[in-house]
Amino acid sequence: MKKIICLGFLLMALYMNIGAQASVNVFDPFYEDLSIWEGIGLINDAPSIRPYPLQEIKRLLQIIIEKGDVGQRQRAEAYYKRFFGKTFHFGGLSEVTVKAPQKQYELNFAPFMDLNYALHDLFTISGRVSVFLTNKLFSQALTPLFQYSKHDLADDGVFIGKFLVLPVFNTGLAIGTPQYYFTAGIARTSYGPFHEHSPFIGSQAIHQGQFIFVVNKEKWTYNQAFLTLTATNDQGGNRTPGKFIMIHSLNIRPLSWLSFGIVDTIIYGKRFEPIYMLPLSAFFISQGLYAFPDNSLIGGTFTIKPIRGLRLDGMLYADDLGFNEIVKFKKDAKWRMSGQFGVTYTMPQTHWFSFADLNYTFVFPYTYTHFDGSNVGVPNYQNYTHNGVPLGSNLEPNSDRIQLKVKFRPLYGLDLNVSNTFIRHANINESITDIGLLKDYVSKKYTTDGSTFNHATITNSDGAKDHAFLYSNPFMKQQTRQYVNQLSLEASCHLPIVKSGGYMLFKLGYVFEANINPGVRQNIYRPNDRTKGWNDKSITDIGEAKIREEAARQLAEWRKGAIGRQFNHYIRLSAEVAY
């Protein structure tokens, strides 16, 4: 009877198809502890794609229970009891966020039910059913710059007073063993070795339909994920289905302290392409069969653990490279890529000092952007976004970031997190001097805000016409730059409820944000009454001097509006209890 009830919940989840996950959700505290266990070398073979199915979670926890010290085993046993001790956990969460000096606030309340059940050793299901009462949608959440809501909320148009009532149903099923498994569900995804804001697939993007296949052997792992995305136009609106991303990777572990891998990605839309389902294929070559209609990227990763507790990670992700210039060692070449490098030291044994992490991320100009049609109002199926949010790094193109994070654990269940994040960003369009590009920018509607929606191409009715910076990489060479510094302090108390296997999670967080030149992320150029009719005229008919004069006027106006200072304070208090 119990199996029939669980199967009924599974079928209901697949039918409703409107949610995000629970016990294997990428923000579960389990994954934070897993990163610590990976840092000290207790775990060296976890797959790159998260979330993991219950089969893999059980394997990882059993390793810690067997090999960890007293404190590590205590945490692992608490997780084990929560995931595998009871089928259902019922609870609720409440969250209050205040942003000052704007005097804005965000309220979230949600009862929920968690489900973790093994119908068979080879077949597991998990999920979270919840109903949110909130005064903010996903796009309205009060978060620091370049961060996004962790709640998967879609506007359903139902209100109780001033509160939106939004159902969220996150679910997943898995078939297989820890060595070979296939998962299907709706959840957020992250792709290592940097899971927080991965340049491959970042956890900041709202949940997606996901189909994941993994082969995990002692010396190597093959990961493959097919995600169903939401397309938007180049202004972030007009949400449309039919956008997909396929990403696969091969990770090699010749030694316990060394791993490296290659990652291959294709993003496309308006059709389902079976050839991209083939494992161990090269997407760039595969799309060549159809005259290269899609957007392919390729990357590489490495992890080195030279001594216990010390971990070095790195990755590069190439979007579009000027290969002919690069192989000739020419100074000026097209480099559209992102990368992240980090060093972490984790205390090998349970200690009041848990870890310190320093990492650097860059996103070169036009990385993750892509031309897909001559009109900014039509869906873009090839840029690296989902539902209007960056799918890879949470940074915009032409940005970089350095981040220091430190975690203290003075008592069991009590975490004190301190971090400082410094971000630079500049609008690539400030460097545009080409007269053809300037003429189009001031006479036709384009996105010129320097975001992932701002591609390098100008168009006519026949498609692409010209491209910016084909033979150079003006990374952070602009006159007007945005500087953001975020100092974050957080206290978190996470305690198990021994009797039921549930948990209590309380958090109090504060972020001080300094934002210098906040208007950099606004459009620089736009058509107006002065340029009316220019789109149908040639540069000769208009006059180059007249075009440059109008472009200079708009650029000067943008610079005046971009410069300034803002200081923001974010205070967040949350409580979550599951019994």
Where are the model-predicted features located?
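C-terminal beta-signal and adjacent terminal beta-strands/loops
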Residues: 499, 504-556
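Sec-dependent N-terminal signal peptides
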Residues: 4-14
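Outer-membrane beta-barrel "beta-signal"
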Residues: 493-495, 565-579
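Sec/Tat signal peptide C-region and signal peptidase I cleavage site
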Residues: 16-20
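Transmembrane beta-strands of outer-membrane beta-barrel proteins
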Residues: 89-95, 126-130, 183-187, 223-227, ...
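Extracellular loop and loop/strand-boundary signature of outer-membrane beta-barrel proteins
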Residues: 99-100, 154-159, 195-199, 233-238, ...
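Signature for the C-terminal beta-barrel architecture of outer-membrane proteins
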Residues: 181, 190, 202, 208-389, ...
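Outer-membrane beta-barrel channel domains
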Residues: 22-28, 39-259, 330, 350, ...
